[in-house]
From Swiss-Prot:
Gene Ontology CC, one term: membrane
InterPro entries: YjcZ-like
Location relative to the cell: Membrane
Record bears the keyword Metal-binding: no
Segments passing through the bilayer: 19-39
The protein's name in its UniProt record: SPbeta prophage-derived membrane protein YosA
UniProt keyword Protease, yes or no: no
Keywords: Membrane, Transmembrane, Transmembrane helix
UniProt similarity note: Belongs to the SscA family.
Main localization category: membrane
Record's bilayer topology term: Single-pass membrane protein
Length: 39
């Protein structure tokens, strides 16, 4: 819920593009690092 409210707030604020891309990149990096430690 916190992510969704921040997502819609960024969208209406006009800063949707950069913040969303930043979140996606951080999420992908987190998955890669996690997979590296698991395997």
């Amino acid at each position: 819920m916190g992510f969704y409210s921040g997502y819609s707030g960024g969208y209406s604020g006009g800063g949707y593009g950069s913040s969303f891309v930043l979140i996606v990149v951080l999420f992908i990096l987190l998955i890669i690092v996690g997979a590296t430690f698991l395997y």
